[in-house]
Amino acid sequence: MAYSSGFNPHPRISYANASPTSAASEAEYLELGLSDRCDPAKVGAALDEVLGPGLDVVEVAEVLPGAASLNDLLAASAWRIELGQSDPEALASAVGQLLSRDELVVQRMTKTGLRDFDVRGAIVELRVTPEGALLFLGRHEVPLVRPDDVVTALRLLVPGLGGERPAMLTRLGQGVVAEPHAAGTLVDPFSGELAQLF
């Protein structure tokens, strides 16, 4: 493991686009700085040994000099959002209303105070499944629109949508939006291949 320099060295670990607190995820990424070149498979196996149940290393890749940064490769996320007791027709109506707008601003409290987020501007795709869940594909823009901001926007359009309980959020994948965009897909950050996420 490589460490930072200075009076208080710490491990060189950076998390790219960490998901919000309480969200589940199938696609979290981190970069580790190592002091020596190591076999990626051995690094993955060593991490798997010490991670808790439910935290699995799926893939490890070596970053070569001059390669794109992880943040550049993770420019969008695909999410499944479950609101609970939602009428699929009301949900579809709210989605239609949101997608028909050029802008829909919600507010969220951040460390620096109340901040505005244009939910509509970040949406690449938003649709309702037959089971009444939402599938949301959004760009990682500044400021970052999170899936709970999408829920807030939908509840502004249709008050009481899904009841009062917090939505269950699951990140399905991260990558880059291909142009032209194919529904439910992102470019995989490791392989560069188009990945079907929903």
Question: What are the roles of these predicted feature ranges?
Answer:
Residues 1, 51-56, 159-163:
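Short secondary-structure junctions
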Residues 3-35, 64-65:
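Short, charge-patterned binding micro-sites
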Residues 10-19, 60-68, 112-128:
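Short amphipathic beta-strand starts and helix->beta connectors
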Residues 26-80:
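Ordered, amphipathic secondary-structure segments that act as subunit-interaction surfaces
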Residues 35-40, 86-88, 140-143:
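Helix N-cap motif at beta-to-alpha junctions
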Residues 40-51, 90-101, 149-153:
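Short amphipathic alpha-helices in soluble, non-transmembrane regions
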Residues 79-115:
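A contiguous pocket-lining binding segment that forms or flanks enzyme active sites
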Residues 100-198:
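Core RNA-modification/binding signature centered on pseudouridine synthases
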